[in-house]
Amino acid sequence: MKHLITLTILLLSSLLMCSCSRSELEPCDDYRQAMRDFVVRISETARAQNPDFIVIPQNGIELVTLGEDAEAALATDYLSAIDGHGQEDLFYGYRRNDTPTPANTTDYLLSYLRRSKEAGNTILVTDYCSRPDYVANAHTQCDAEGFVSFAAPERELNVIPASVPPHENAQDIARLSDAQNFLYLLNPENFDSRADFIHAVASTNYDVIIMDLFFNDGTSFTADEIEHLKQKENGGKRLVICYMSIGEAEDYRYYWQASWKQHKPVWLARENHSWPGNYKVRYWYSAWQELICGPGDSYLNRILQAGFDGVYLDIIDAFEYFEKQ
């Protein structure tokens, strides 16, 4: 009988603990607005230090309007906080590399992207294709829309294309709206050293470089290295933008604590099985936002200290994950 009572108490305790953990979750009434507010906070924090700092969210283009479709009222506060939009797979790569994106998906994305462009934003499109005819068509389609095109040969974004950038030029690029092309080189795994990476990127004439803050060994690029990359090989000046994920936590980043895998902070959600080591986050939690853009040793402050011209925000579309829960 004592064993039965003990077992019952343990079961009740377990249920109470589960109930408490659920009740401890901060409610979010509007996942889309919460993401907009987060991006606005990042923008305001950065521009307090550098008024010219560039902010570019990637994907999650639905946030540009306040309703359920592209014709709804514009989210003006959000649009005022950003300088452009990054969009993956617009024409190629939605299902897999070197595959045309379904026409209905392209049309859906275009309906929002056009509104963002009309509001004054620069649209950076990354299509995942390497076939020469697909690459040429991706550039042509973007030109027709007034978008800036990059055809990524690999999904891992670890390759500098062998071809010259579209609309290669020697102009000084002072604003994102000046850009006619860009390089998205997020993963430096194919480079044996920092010096090799710096040399390879510096030897290009792209108007904008989007890269990570860190090299393969986990050390961040220095302000001197970033300053060196701000000059094209032909002598023109360019912008160097830093990638930062704000909708997922990554277990290889400096902020990650080993204990989180056994004792998750309340804002840490499920692992993304498509990208092992990446975890969805409840991005409306102040504790997560402090890691990203709070005072002190936040991710954003590290980016600012390294001298980047702006930030390229990923997993903006995390709101979709929570809307489906």
Name each model feature, range by range.
Residues 1-4:
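Positively charged n-region of N-terminal signal peptides that target proteins for export
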Residues 8-15:
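Bacterial N-terminal signal peptides
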Residues 18-19:
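C-terminal motif of bacterial Sec signal peptides marking the signal peptidase cleavage site
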Residues 23-325:
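Glycan-processing catalytic domains of CAZymes
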